[in-house]
Amino acid sequence: MSQIMYNYPAMLAHAAEMNTYSGALHAVGADIAAEQHALASAWQGDTGMTYQAWQAQWNQAMEELVRAYRAMATTHEQNTMAMSARDQAEGAKWG
């Protein structure tokens, strides 16, 4: 029977890195939104209305993406901590 080995510090570092990436995604989204906002005043009538609808969809999609990525990072961290605690508890049984 083979053993399954986990590198908990590396797994936690990966979760932290995922949180960093979610922050980067948020920053890129904010930059793009600022650029689009600068252009919005030039779009009027039907074009302006179409732009506003597109921008609302884009903003919502970006928020959902960032929220989902943060949730993945949090879940990864929580599961890693739970696995580590379980390993320690099982190890304590063996003295």
Curated annotation (Swiss-Prot):
A cellular component term, taken from the record's GO annotations: extracellular region
Cellular localisation: Secreted
Primary location: secreted
Keywords, alphabetical: Secreted
Family: Belongs to the WXG100 family. ESAT-6 subfamily.
Complex formation: Forms a tight 1:1 complex with EsxG.
Name this polypeptide is given: ESAT-6-like protein EsxH
UniProt source species: Mycolicibacterium smegmatis (strain ATCC 700084 / mc(2)155) (Mycobacterium smegmatis)
